[in-house]
């Protein structure tokens, strides 16, 4: 069953992290993961579990990232969506 929520890929998640000015350690802490998990995911060394990917995406969304699925998958920053400032 689809929830209609956009599921971002590793490249989009990394770009969103960089856009927010977060390093891998900061994102890992925010998502409740390790820096090694973030690094391996971004490098494509491991495919994350759905829960891992969801935790990464949720941590970014709480900081104002809105993931989109138009012509190409992507994201934008929406200041009104910020729950946790970076």
Per-segment meaning from a language model:
Residues 1-18, 68:
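A short, Lys/Arg-rich alpha-helix, primarily the initiator
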Residues 13, 24-28, 38-41:
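Conserved hydrophobic/aromatic packing and binding residues within compact polymer-binding modules
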Residues 19, 30:
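Residues within the alpha-helical elements of helix-turn-helix
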Residues 22, 33, 65:
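Short glycine/serine/threonine/alanine-rich loop segments
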Residues 32-48:
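Recognition helix of helix-turn-helix/homeodomain-like DNA-binding domains
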Residues 51-69:
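DNA major-groove recognition helix of helix-turn-helix/homeodomain DNA-binding modules
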Residues 65-86:
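Helix-turn-helix/homeodomain-like alpha-helical modules used for DNA recognition
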């Amino acid at each position: 069953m689809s929830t209609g929520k956009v599921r971002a890929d590793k490249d989009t998640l990394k770009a969103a992290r960089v856009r927010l000015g977060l390093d891998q350690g900061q994102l890992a802490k925010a998502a409740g993961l390790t820096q090694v998990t973030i690094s391996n995911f971004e490098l494509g060394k491991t495919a994350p579990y759905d829960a891992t990917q969801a935790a990464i995406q949720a941590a970014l969304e709480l900081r104002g990232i809105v993931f989109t699925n138009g012509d190409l998958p992507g994201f934008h920053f929406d200041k009104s969506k910020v729950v946790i400032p970076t």
